[in-house]
C-alpha cells in the first residue's frame, strides 16, 4: 500500500529544493493565515455571537473552514502543479475509505475515554445540551477541519518533503511542525505536547501506508468531534460548550485524565499513540518484506 504514496512522490516533476521545500512552506503559512483571517468578515456577515464562534456552531466557522479547504486545494494545485489525486484524494472507494477512517477514529477516542473512565480519573455527567441541528452543524465543520489540517501536513507537505529528505526525516519534521501550531493552546503540558507530536507521527505513518487522505481526514475529524462534543473532554486545551456528556477530571489524577488539556495530555493517549504507530510500522515493514520476496 505504501506504493500509492510513493507514486505521489515519484510523480512530482520538480527537482529544485527551493520549490520542494521553501515554496510549500510559504504556501502553507499563507493558507493558515488566510484561514485565521477569513473568520472575521464571516462573523460579521452571519452575525454570529461569540458563544457560537467559540462553540464551533456558528455559520462563520463552517463556511470559513470549507472555503479554507477549497482555497488550499486551489493554491496547491496551481502553485505546485499537483493534482487532487497527488494530494491524496483518491477517486476509488471514497465512501468506504472515509467510513474506515471514521471507524478507526471513533475506536481510538472511545478506547482512551473508557480506559480513563475505568481508572476513575474522570467523572461523567450526562447533559445532552446540544440541539440536533447544532450537533450536525458542528460535525460538518469538523469534517472540513479534519481534511483541512490533513491536506496541509500529509497531503501537501509530506510528498514534497519526502522527495528531498526522505520519508523518515519528513515524518519527524512534519510532526514537529504539527506540534508547533498547537503551542498557543491553553493548559498545554509536556505530556500534551508529546502526545500532539505522537499524533502527528501516527497520522503520517497511516498516510504513508495508505496514501489515502479521506481515511486520515476522517480519523482526525471523528477524534476531535467525539472528544469534544460526545464525551465532553477538552479538545487540545479548549473547553467545549455543547456536548452529550461532560468528562470532568478528578483532582490528583491529571496524569491519567490529561487535566484541563483533555485526554490528549493523558498517559493513556501516549501509550495508545505509541501502540498504533508501532503497529503501522510493523505493517509497513511486513509489506516491504513481501515486496522483496516477489
What is each stretch, according to the model?
Residues 226-294:
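C-terminal membrane module of polytopic membrane proteins
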Residues 2-8, 40-60, 82-151, 158-163, ...:
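Juxtamembrane helix-loop-helix connectors linking adjacent transmembrane helices
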Residues 21-26, 63, 98-103, 135-136, ...:
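Hydrophobic alpha-helical transmembrane segments
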Residues 25-36, 69-75, 106-114, 270-285:
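Hydrophobic core of alpha-helical transmembrane segments in multi-pass integral membrane proteins
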Residues 14, 148-173, 205-212:
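Membrane-interface helix/loop boundary segments of multi-pass membrane proteins
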Amino acid at each position: 500500500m505504501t506504493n500509492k504514496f510513493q507514486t505521489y512522490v515519484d510523480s512530482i516533476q520538480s527537482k529544485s529544493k527551493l520549490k520542494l521545500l521553501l515554496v510549500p512552506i510559504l504556501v502553507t503559512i499563507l493558507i493558515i493565515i488566510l484561514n485565521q483571517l477569513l473568520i472575521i468578515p464571516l462573523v460579521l456577515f452571519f452575525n454570529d455571537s461569540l458563544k457560537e464562534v467559540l462553540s464551533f456552531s456558528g455559520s462563520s466557522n463552517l463556511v470559513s473552514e470549507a472555503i479554507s479547504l477549497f482555497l488550499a486545494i486551489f493554491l496547491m494545485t496551481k502553485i505546485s502543479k499537483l493534482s487532487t489525486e497527488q494530494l491524496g484524494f483518491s477517486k476509488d472507494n471514497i465512501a468506504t475509505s472515509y467510513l474506515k477512517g471514521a471507524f478507526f477514529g471513533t475506536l481510538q477516542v472511545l478506547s482512551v475515554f473508557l480506559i480513563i473512565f475505568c481508572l476513575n480519573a474522570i467523572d461523567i455527567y450526562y447533559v445532552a445540551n446540544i440541539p440536533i441541528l447544532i450537533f450536525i452543524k458542528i460535525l460538518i465543520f469538523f469534517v472540513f477541519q479534519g481534511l483541512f489540517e490533513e491536506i496541509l501536513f500529509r497531503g501537501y507537505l509530506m510528498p514534497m518533503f519526502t522527495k528531498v529528505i526522505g520519508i523518515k526525516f519528513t515524518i519527524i519534521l512534519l510532526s514537529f511542525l504539527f506540534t508547533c501550531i498547537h503551542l498557543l493552546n491553553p493548559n498545554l503540558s509536556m505530556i500534551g505536547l508529546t502526545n500532539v507530536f505522537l499524533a502527528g507521527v501516527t497520522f503520517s505513518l497511516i498516510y504513508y501506508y495508505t496514501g489515502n487522505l479521506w481515511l486520515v481526514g476522517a480519523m482526525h475529524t471523528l477524534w476531535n468531534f467525539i472528544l469534544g462534543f460526545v464525551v465532553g473532554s477538552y479538545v487540545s486545551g479548549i473547553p467545549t460548550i455543547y456536548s452529550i456528556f461532560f468528562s470532568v477530571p478528578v483532582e490528583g489524577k491529571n496524569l491519567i485524565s490529561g487535566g484541563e488539556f483533555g485526554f490528549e495530555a493523558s498517559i493513556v493517549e501516549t501509550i495508545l499513540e505509541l501502540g498504533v504507530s508501532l503497529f503501522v510500522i510493523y505493517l509497513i515493514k511486513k509489506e516491504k518484506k513481501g515486496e522483496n520476496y516477489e
